[in-house]
């Protein structure tokens, strides 16, 4: 596979920045990394080469731009997924929700949030129905919300095809 070929060329997998060596070239994963991780790699003297997916990079830039505008970032996705963690690592205080129930609970506990400027972004692999239920709820509740559907179309197509295939198999 790809990793075997990379290892044959002298590439090694590291789990944390403290495993990087000065002068070593480190390629980031497609899911992206937090600002803290990239800073730690550079502090160790590693040369960082970004392999982040352009769709993920776009979400990170949207989040940063929104924060500069004074908006709170709302990420819909799997909170422990590397992509979500990487994007969140570029934000000052993002809200991460996995489903509409979590969104509803948060708004019940923080009713003033509905009037604050915010932006809603999705993990690229977020399940469309989950995203849409969160959008529907927040649209009704929030008075200053920007919504950016950042689900990757190619991923969405594969998810739909997989669901169709499994339905046929049942």
Protein language model regions, located:
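The feature marks the mature, well-folded catalytic cores of soluble enzymes
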Residues: 1-170
